Structures are given as C-alpha cells and as structure tokens.
Regions:
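Terminal targeting signals and extreme-terminal segments of soluble enzymes
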Residues: 1-152
C-alpha cells in the first residue's frame, strides 16, 4: 500500500456484521491474514484480547490435521491482538515467535487464542498465549514484538 492509499488504523479494523463471528473484528487491509484465516479478534469484558477462526479443509496438512504453519501464523496474528493496548499508536513487527504443539486440530473446530503481555517497556513487548481447538489446548506460544514507529 502506498502512502497515498494508506488509511488510518481504525479504518483497517472492520466489525463483522453477520455470521458466526458477528460482533468480532477483522483486518480488512491484511491480504495475507485474509487468505490464511481469516482471523477474527475481540476483547473480553476485562479488556483481554481474544483471536479466533474456524478450521477449514484448506488449513489441514496431508494427514488431515491442521498444518503447524497455520497455527503459528494464527499465533503471530494473535500476539498483536494481545498487545494492542501496549502498542498504542505504534506499528510493530515480530522479533521472535516460538511455540510448542500440544495436540492436533481438525476441520470444523473453533480455533481460539487467549494471551497476555508479560512485559512491555520502551520498544519491546513480551507476549504469551495458548491456542485451543474447541477448548482443547493445541499450541502454547511466546513472542517478542518490537515497536517500529507510529501507525499511519
């Protein structure tokens, strides 16, 4: 996206108005996440970020289980939901993301991630989370995010 095409942060996050994820939000400007997910997000009553998507056949590997790369891509998206308040108006990138696969996920399951910021200071934010498939833990992950400048 060129600077002429840039839109504000608030314009990129769109509220879903129908379907299973009605009331959630999705990034309309992230073509990769749309293809990989799409991934949805919202905040609970306590202000904690939640990310989710419905497992589809295209998310599965040759063995019929969710591809590990899909889960890690989802985790990489979710960490920014968890860090939203710590990020403020800053743009950021993932410096490190590591995960431990705990179980497999299958077609039709609701994949949901919940997490928290464990430390935020200066330009670095540390995050951890767990992704579940229909409530069953499938991935635990930790990440380091680096702020790189204000959002357009």
């Amino acid at each position: 996206m060129s600077e002429d095409q840039a839109v504000s942060f608030e314009d990129r996050l769109v509220r879903v108005t129908e379907g299973e994820f009605e009331g959630w939000y999705v990034w309309q400007s992230d073509a990769f996440e749309q293809r990989a997910g799409p991934f949805y997000e919202r905040f609970d009553a306590d202000g904690r970020g939640i990310a989710a998507f419905r497992a589809d056949l295209r998310h599965m590997n040759g063995g019929g289980f969710m591809h590990g790369g899909c889960l890690m891509t989802f985790a990489d998206s979710a960490i920014f939901t968890f860090a939203r308040h710590a990020l403020g108006k800053s743009h950021a990138v993932t410096m490190n993301l590591s995960g431990d696969f705990l179980d497999s996920a299958r077609v039709g399951e609701l994949i949901e991630a919940r997490g928290e910021v464990t430390r935020a200071g200066g330009k670095t934010i540390f995050v951890r989370g767990v992704a579940t498939a229909d409530g069953r833990p499938v991935l635990s992950f930790t990440a380091i995010i680096k702020k790189i400048g204000p959002r357009v």
